[in-house]
């Protein structure tokens, strides 16, 4: 089971730390040599976290600037025209995660067709050496870079010798002998396998957005819900169903149950996200909210009446509350 207390303690270390975010590498002007890692870091999963921890630790011990170079949009959206690709984290969620891990500078490089045509040697010389004043590069075991992903880790190590920087290669991080990747994380979310998702992420998968007014059907059944609206269209959503969730409300953790789906019992037409908190009273309309998913309870179903649906919600609440002690 995911140890949430350990996760909170680990990330609270940099709770008041402020990371600088720079859009486009041309806007960065090095003040001292840097230690850099490169990637999309979608999900910032446990493999990414190993790289980031090494980056921050070595930056401190070697007096280097800790830089994460990432790309937006995701290269697949540009190179493969993959308009269906959904992101595990929004750019802002990624920013928050990297900041809590102690990264000094996040450079968000616009990924364009022109940028993708840089050869490996051009990327090394123009971006890493001249642009970032690199002293050390930390990368994952499967990293490839340059036009058409032409260069490997071994190529990078040779470039390091040529341009006088070190290259540290980080091995795969496993969960139950399975190498973790963003694709594996994405697949578990889509399958509703949230417990496995959270193992891969080392933290709860989350959804963030604004609370908007709904049609108050839940309130009529005794289950007033907060309706979450996510503005980012490419944000990954889990498959339809009921989930045990938690959120930080009024400086404390509140548990609840979330339904994501079209609400077939009331002939809903579009996907909606509704959360009922067990021990919270108050008006959340207009607030920004981050919902952390802990476990899936069941798939979405259609019921003959609102009364039948209400009975099922009571069962769902009891199922959720039995699970809560595991997360305290």
Describe these PLM feature segments:
Residues 214-328:
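Phosphate/ribose-recognition catalytic cores of enzymes acting on nucleotide-derived substrates
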Residues 160-257:
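Glycine-rich, Lys/Arg-enriched anion-binding loops that position phosphate/diphosphate groups
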Residues 45, 98, 137, 197, ...:
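Residue-level signal for inorganic ion chemistry
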Residues 77-141, 145-163:
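N-terminal Rossmann-like or analogous alpha/beta NTP/dinucleotide-binding catalytic cores
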Residues 25-90:
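N-terminal catalytic cores of NTP/NDP-binding nucleotidyl/phosphoryl-transfer enzymes
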């Amino acid at each position: 089971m995911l140890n949430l207390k350990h996760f909170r303690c680990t990330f609270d270390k940099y709770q008041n730390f402020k990371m600088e975010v720079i859009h486009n590498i041309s806007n960065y002007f090095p003040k001292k040599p840097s230690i850099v890692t490169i990637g999309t870091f979608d999900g910032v999963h446990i493999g990414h976290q190993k790289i980031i921890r090494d980056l921050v630790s070595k930056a401190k011990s070697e007096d280097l600037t800790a830089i994460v170079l990432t790309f937006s949009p995701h290269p697949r959206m540009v190179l493969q025209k993959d308009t269906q690709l959904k992101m595990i984290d929004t750019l802002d969620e990624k920013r928050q995660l990297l900041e809590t891990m102690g990264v000094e500078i996040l450079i968000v490089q616009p990924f364009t067709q022109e940028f993708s045509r840089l050869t490996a040697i051009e990327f090394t010389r123009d971006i890493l050496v001249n642009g970032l004043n690199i002293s050390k590069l930390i990368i994952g075991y499967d990293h490839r870079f340059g036009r058409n992903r032409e260069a490997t880790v071994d190529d990078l190590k040779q470039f390091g010798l040529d341009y006088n920087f070190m290259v540290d290669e980080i091995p795969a991080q496993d969960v139950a002998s399975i190498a973790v990747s963003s694709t594996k994380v994405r697949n578990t979310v889509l399958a509703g396998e949230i417990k496995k998702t959270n193992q891969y992420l080392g933290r709860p998968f989350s959804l963030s957005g604004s609370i908007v007014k709904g049609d108050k059907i839940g309130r009529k059944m005794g289950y007033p819900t907060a309706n979450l609206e996510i503005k980012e269209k490419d944000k990954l959503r889990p498959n339809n169903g009921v989930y045990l969730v938690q959120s930080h409300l009024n400086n404390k953790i509140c548990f609840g149950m979330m339904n994501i789906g079209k609400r077939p019992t009331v002939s809903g037409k579009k996907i909606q996200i509704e959360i009922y908190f067990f021990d919270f009273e108050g008006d959340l309309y207009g607030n920004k909210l981050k919902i952390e998913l802990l476990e899936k309870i069941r798939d979405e179903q259609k019921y003959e009446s609102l009364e039948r649906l209400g009975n099922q919600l009571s069962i769902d609440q009891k199922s959720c509350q039995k699970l809560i002690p595991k997360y305290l």
